[in-house]
Swiss-Prot record:
Pfam families: DsbD_N, DsbD_TM, Thioredoxin_7. Required to facilitate the formation of correct disulfide bonds in some periplasmic proteins and for the assembly of the periplasmic c-type cytochromes. Acts by transferring electrons from cytoplasmic thioredoxin to the periplasm. This transfer involves a cascade of disulfide bond formation and reduction steps. Its EC number is 1.8.1.8. Residues 468-613 form the Thioredoxin domain. This is Thiol:disulfide interchange protein DsbD. Disulfide bonds join C135-C141, C229-C350, C530-C533. It comes from Vibrio parahaemolyticus serotype O3:K6 (strain RIMD 2210633). Residues 1-21 form the signal peptide.
Length: 613
């Protein structure tokens, strides 16, 4: 149903967040988990997966990670902070763009990583705290790692006065340090200086991963051009741009392209600015309060497209910008370019809401390249009708009419899709499905309502009516399945739940209770940063057959997201290298160590695995 909505709502996914990109789940299948063989042997300890070294040379600290084949480091999970010392901007290369179903657009390192950390204002007891996290491509993630590096005194003004210390293999210190001394912090996600050597490779990979974004923004721009606030202005705008006198088609084409490039420059700069801000707040964008706030904002923007109220720049600001634009000389390339750049700032009531939504999408992606190109494509789409009018005259433009209001309303439905995409991360699947159904019913109901008022009739009108009816049924089906489906299955879903444990003592207590009851135990180690843990929860544990079998188990879950002292002790107690890890005990209370599962496993092989108990 979602694919149908995306097509018929003209690019519904334009405002989708990076979190919609799906991992290919098959690649995470752990074939070794189909038997009780020890699957833990297939993953190495974190110090072997990401060997870490550092050395200090005067006022510079060099950090070095080697990345084992088949593993990767998260750029967004890498941070460097200082105690009793100030740190400059990190000098490092950007990671490779990577789409994650649960974490959205992230950047990863699959090759050795070198980071240069400038040091300044050394004080007694100075040290640098390095935090990082990585995963195996097979769907196995390590807990966040912390390395504490003591910093030797240095004299920044004398470059050659000190001799570089010997590269040192670091030792882990996973305890969080609560510093009472002055602290400087540098986050990799907000301070990156791309290395010139890898810039081309990074750009190519980014474009390859996001090839559809510019196309959808181009289509969005064309759609905005046909709203009632924009389309009637093109003939007037064309006369202003071209100036007085007759011009050849070639000259008219050139001037119109120059105007559109000026407008595209403004939009591109807007995209770069908000994408830069988005990189700093990318982690915060995942917080439920932020997601709810953004959803309310999108709904507010959508209401303006439905005509509930008018959303635009203050009239005084628009008047000032218009006067500034009118002072430019039409017919000259420089004047036309300036008019285009200024006009990009004049948001009409029809374009303010979609443009705001587009900027929010770009801000959440936190990707400079994608942000700049997407907004450039949006401006080019809006400029296509202007180019057509300038070259061929007004005869190519469709006549103004009620159809333009319908285009505006359609954009309102597209904007309403954005909050559903955002809220899917925090809402139960039942509620997100209900919201999608409600949006589909509203959109296709509106389409059926307006079919009789369309300018054309005959078989085209009938076809639209059929599409609307089919869309209504398709949209309502998921909600109907929840309301009138198999109540027995739904009852099973509500009875499967985990008991949370926080430390070793609570684990021992629950194991003793399960042994007394004669029931096997399953312990799931979970963390919010673990992608495969969320896949287990979404695709495996909610399978009806798996849920039925899990009724025979005592289900325990340890949430180690915060990586506190008690979490580390529990992980060490169970000899857990990373997540996801699932442990089993039989009905006699014996730990079945060779039944351990590491890495994602789909429902069918997981069911075969637990059926052995």
């Amino acid at each position: 149903m979602r694919a149908l909505l995306s097509v018929l709502l003209l690019g519904l996914i334009t405002f989708s967040t990076p979190s919609l990109a799906l991992f290919g789940k098959d690649q995470f299948n752990n074939s070794q988990n189909n038997s009780f063989g020890s699957s833990n042997d297939s993953f190495v300890p974190v110090d072997q997966a990401f060997p870490f070294n550092f050395y200090q040379q005067d006022d510079k600290l060099m950090l070095d990670w080697q990345v084992r084949d088949g593993y990767y480091l998260y750029q967004e999970r890498l941070s460097v902070s200082g105690e009793n010392i100030s740190l400059g901007e990190l000098q490092m290369e950007n990671g490779t763009p990577h789409k994650d179903e649960f974490f959205g657009d992230v950047h990863i390192y699959t090759t050795p990583l070198f980071v240069n950390v400038p040091l300044d204002e050394w004080q007694e007891g100075a040290r640098v705290i390095v935090q990082y996290q990585g995963c195996a491509k097979a769907g196995f993630c390590y807990p966040p790692e912390t390395r504490i590096i003591p910093i030797d005194a240095f004299t920044a003004s004398i470059a050659d006065s000190a001799v570089a210390t010997k590269p040192t293999q670091s030792t882990a210190n996973n305890n969080q340090t609560n510093a009472t001394s002055p602290t400087a912090s540098t986050s990799v996600s907000s301070n990156n200086t791309p290395a010139p050597v890898t810039e081309q490779d990074s750009l190519a990979a980014n474009l390859a991963d996001n090839w559809w974004t510019p196309l959808l923004f181009l289509a969005l721009g064309v759609g905005l051009a046909f709203t009632p606030c924009v389309l009637p202005m093109y003939p007037i705008l064309t006369s202003i741009v071209l100036g007085s006198g007759k011009l050849s088609q070639r000259r008219a084409l050139g001037l119109s392209l120059v105007y559109v490039q000026g407008m595209a420059l403004t939009y591109t700069l807007l995209g770069l600015v908000v994408a830069s801000a988005g990189m700093q707040f990318q982690a915060a964008m995942q917080h439920p309060y932020v997601l709810i706030g953004l959803s309310i904002l999108f709904v507010t923007l959508a209401l303006s497209m439905f005509g509930v109220y008018t959303l635009q720049l203050p009239s005084s600001v628009q008047t000032w910008l218009n006067n500034l634009s009118n002072k430019q000389q039409g017919g000259s390339s420089a004047g036309v370019f300036a008019m285009g750049a200024i006009s990009g700032l004049v948001c009409s009531p029809c374009t303010t809401a979609p443009l705001s939504g587009a900027l929010l999408y770009v801000a959440q992606s936190g990707d400079l390249l994608t942000g700049g190109i997407a907004l450039y494509a949006l401006a080019m789409g809006m400029g296509i009708p202007l180019i057509l009018v300038a070259v061929f005259g007004n005869k190519l433009l469709p006549k103004a009419g009620g159809w333009m209001d319908r285009v505006k309303t359609l954009f309102g439905f597209i904007l309403l899709a954005a909050p559903i995409f955002l809220l899917e991360r925090i809402l139960p699947e039942m509620w997100s499905t209900a919201l999608w159904s409600a949006l589909g019913i509203a959109a296709f109901g509106w389409l059926y309502h307006i079919k009789n008022s369309l300018e054309f009739g005959g078989w085209k009108q009938s076809a639209i009516g059929i599409i609307a009816v089919l869309g209504l049924f398709a949209s309502a089906q998921p909600a109907l399945n929840y309301w009138f489906g198999n109540h027995e299955t739904q009852a099973q879903q509500t009875t499967v739940s985990f008991t949370r444990i926080a430390n070793v003592a609570e684990l021992e207590e629950q194991l003793a209770l399960a042994k007394a009851a004669g029931k096997p135990v399953m312990l799931d180690f979970y963390a919010d940063w673990c992608v495969a843990c969320k896949e287990f929860e979404k695709y495996t544990f909610h399978d009806p057959k798996v849920e039925a079998k899990l009724q025979d188990f005592v289900l325990l879950q340890a949430d180690v997201t915060k990586n506190q002292v008690q979490d580390i002790e529990l992980l060490k107690h169970m000899n857990v290298l990373g997540l996801p890890t699932i442990e089993f005990w039989d009905a006699k209370g014996e730990h079945v160590s060779n039944a351990r599962l590491t890495g994602f496993m789909q429902a069918e092989p997981f069911l075969e695995h637990i059926n052995r108990f």
